[in-house]
């Protein structure tokens, strides 16, 4: 950063001319990869108006995840392509919406709704195995439980760990957290590395 207390955007601009190819892992019919955890940065997207209109834009009634919902819907009507390198900086801070705790896992609800609506296949017949989808849900449940265990409600954490355990995700850790959730007072301690 330049001298001083802030950095004007012009000082952070880098030459992106070397990013002329698409990243094959992040390009194509991405629906199943999005279901399985691929993230798309909203701040770097260029979306055709026809795609935006076809999916009806953002669902602003959602409390969280409206951008992920947007990408899932978009991936059903058009291929998506990503450049082969970083093109933006993204700051994540503790007060952002992605860190707000909720009793329910909005991501689990979103993933289940997408799979019920569209199944586990792209329009080009790439599929996500049902077991892989269940593992994805289990990871999301585990993460939801872990966050609630350390910064939220132990009862919610316990229920989320039970869901993860039923799918066989990190069984020993799930059992330990389930047991500890009965005794650990809220707000004490710091989270260890997951």
Features from the language model and the residues they span:
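Proline-centered turn/helix-capping motifs that create local helix->coil transitions or kinks
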Residues: 1-6, 121
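Conserved nucleotide-sugar donor-binding catalytic segment
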Residues: 5-107
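C-terminal, non-catalytic tails of nucleotide-sugar-dependent glycosyltransferases
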Residues: 13-29, 46, 108-136, 188-194
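Solvent-exposed, amphipathic alpha-helical segments
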Residues: 51-54, 144, 148
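Phosphate/oxyanion-binding loops and surfaces in catalytic or ligand/nucleic-acid-binding neighborhoods
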Residues: 77, 81, 114-117, 185
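Catalytic core of nucleotide-sugar-dependent glycosyltransferases
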Residues: 86-94, 99-127, 150-166
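Membrane-interface aromatic/basic loop that binds lipid-linked glycans or pyrophosphate carriers
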Residues: 145-194
């Amino acid at each position: 950063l330049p001298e001083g207390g802030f950095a004007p955007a012009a000082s952070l601009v880098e030459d992106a001319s070397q990013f002329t190819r698409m990243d094959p892992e992040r390009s194509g019919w991405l629906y199943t990869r999005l279901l399985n955890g691929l993230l798309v940065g909203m701040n770097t997207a260029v979306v055709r108006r026809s795609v935006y209109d076809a999916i009806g834009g953002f669902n602003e009634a959602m409390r969280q995840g409206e951008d992920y919902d947007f990408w899932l819907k978009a991936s059903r009507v058009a291929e998506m392509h990503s450049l082969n390198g970083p093109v933006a900086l993204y700051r994540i801070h503790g007060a952002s919406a992605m860190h707000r705790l909720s009793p329910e896992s909005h991501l689990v609800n979103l993933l289940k709704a997408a799979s019920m609506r569209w199944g586990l296949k792209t329009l080009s017949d790439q599929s996500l195995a049902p077991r892989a989808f269940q593992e994805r849900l289990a990871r999301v449940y585990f993460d939801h439980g872990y966050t609630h265990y350390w910064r939220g409600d132990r009862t919610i954490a316990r229920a989320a760990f039970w869901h993860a355990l039923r799918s066989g995700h990190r069984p020993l850790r799930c059992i330990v957290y389930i047991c500890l959730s009965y005794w650990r007072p809220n707000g004490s301690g710091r989270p260890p590395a997951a």
